[in-house]
Amino acid sequence: MPMSSSGYSRTTTHFKMMMATKGKRPLRHLTATDKIDAIQRIHDGESKASVARDIGVPESTLRGWCKNEEKLRYMSRQSAENADKLTSEATAAALTAVAAAELFNGPPEKRMKLEQGLFGKKYDESFYKSPRGMNGLDLSGGGDKGLGVSGGDIIMNGLHGADFSAFAKTAAEISAMGKAKDRYGADLSRNGGGDPGKAELSMAAISPLTSLSHLSGMGGLAQSPLALSFNEIATNLNLIAQLNNNHNLATMSNLGGLTAAQSLRNARPKGNASQSPRASLPDSSGSGGGTPGDKSTPSLTVRNLAKLQQKTSSELQNNGRDPNAPVDEALWYWLKSQQAMLGLNNLYSQMPRPSSPQQPQSTPPTTTTTQQQQPQSSTPPTATPPIVSTPQPTPPSSAPSLTPEDTKNSSWFWQWYKTFGASLMPGDKSCNNNSINATNANNSKYENILYSQLTKGQSPPTTADSLNNNAQPINLNISSNGVVDHLKSEPEDLTTTTNPSMLPPEDHTRFNPSPSTSIKSELKPEVDEDEDEDDEVAKCNGANTAVKQVLDNLLYSQSSPGPVATAPSPLSPSSSTHENGHATPTPLADDLKSTCSEDTDLKSSAEAVEHGEKFLKWLEACSDPNVTAMQVMQFKYLLNSIKLSAERQNGGGEERTRRRRK
């Protein structure tokens, strides 16, 4: 029986509906955590088909989840962070904020344009999130939730239950509080101890960061007074603290005692706000010094710091410094951030390491005395640095840890300015004799070479001066009484020629003065003033003097255009013998004669270079502070030049001999 048209149409429609819905499963709303659990089941060995049937999603969808596993894990972490808020705050505003968070985490083209009314809660709840496992802090800024350390999280640097919820005040509250208290951050901590959990903290403690609003995408300060996420700040502080505790990173040995309980934000009490900030111990940061009647004093900020230092220098000279005055934490927080960026944390530790021994108050005389000596009197930090003092870079491993007494009697500004503004030790009553002697020795060690050349004629000749001027073409002939002969008379006549073969053998000593007289006339002010020097050292010094004269004559003979006529010098009675009975080394005079002549002998030049190398070895082992490294290098270059010149002259003499033989 044929089917009617209406019956056929109904059957066709039903068939189409059955075909359209066949194989379709009801859609299930699965969270990111459920998707991650399904992916983990696949990693554990289950097949994609069985997992897809179990959770009720197509297998192709499950394969897409596996491809986007990293994105799903990120969303799962965010949902885990918001789980506590979603369970405790099941209001419409909270649900709207969570929906807004999901929209913001999507692609840019799928984001909704939401009204400002949806953001009644803190903006950085949903926008700036960091995993809790990384820093152990939950500083998400909830309305009634304390920003502290949860029970099972990591306790970092002794930060037990610190409450930072007071930082979440708006700019209007801060300004109102500042007007009520007549000073910026005046009444912050009365109970001492330096514990932020017990103190009333405000944004004044980190006021330098309020100028960083251009770094954030937020429109104004109504959402966060810092214009930054508290999670970001906490993460950065924890990273800095972990670097401080790591002994392998730049040997930052002085920062282990710096606890995050102080959080770089110990509050400033009522007191003299114009006093210089000082790094104080936790047990001494309680009741501040100063009188309560100085509320008219301007606050100590970064901008007017120099004015306040100049204004209070006389007051600090008269009254001294209060050892119990805590540090101005606004500047201290800014300073620590600068030090962290520059890698200078080890120079400005707030407390010594617990394992470091207590060092005595008087600093031992080392080469770093000018930087490690702490000011014990009331010298203002803005004193003019001495010009002659040369700052030395102190290696981090050699910086001694500060004792509590040194920490109480020194301010962070002094340490900062001492490092970057040259050495500021004015030599006051606090500097003992050892530190003054070490400073003088250090200054003489780094003495300016140009200054030593300019003042050479005003001081007795020293080894440093003679070495520094060894490149000058001067033929120094020293007589028996220690007087330079031809320098005091008229200039030497270079036109006359003297034949070395016509000189009698007994006149060789005019080129080589006696070593004994040279020691008495020239080397006595140069050598160390210890009277118990051995005779062997004196003999070596005498030989070195003779070698230096030969080297000077060699240099002068090479730089002069013609043969050299030496000025006669009177013979001393002891010029033929040495102090210990040895004969005067006459080959040195022969060397000089052969060098001045055209027939240069290799033996004479080589012997002079050999003596010069011996003198160089002695000079490198010399511990005289007047001998600088630059002068030793100059002598090395001079000796090398003489050696090369002798080789060239020897090569020329051999060529002339070959030509004569041919």
UniProtKB/Swiss-Prot annotation:
Residues 265-299, 348-407, 491-537, 558-596 are annotated as: Disordered. Its main location: nucleus. Pfam families: CENP-B_N (PF04218). Residues 48-68 bind DNA. Coiled coil: none annotated. Residues 527-536 have a biased composition (Acidic residues). Residues 511-520 have a biased composition (Polar residues). One of its GO terms (cellular component) is nucleus. InterPro entries: Homeodomain-like_sf, HTH_Psq, RD_transcriptional_regulator, WH-like_DNA-bd_sf. One of its GO terms (molecular function) is DNA-binding transcription factor activity. Keywords: Developmental protein, DNA-binding, Nucleus, Phosphoprotein, Transcription, Transcription regulation. Residues 349-391 have a biased composition (Low complexity). One of its GO terms (biological process) is compound eye development. It is found in: Nucleus. Homomers. Interacts with itself, danr, ey and dac to form a complex (or complexes) containing the RD factors. Probable transcription factor with a role in the retinal determination (RD) network. Contributes to differentiation of antenna-specific characteristics. This is Protein distal antenna. It comes from Culex quinquefasciatus (Southern house mosquito). The gene is dan.
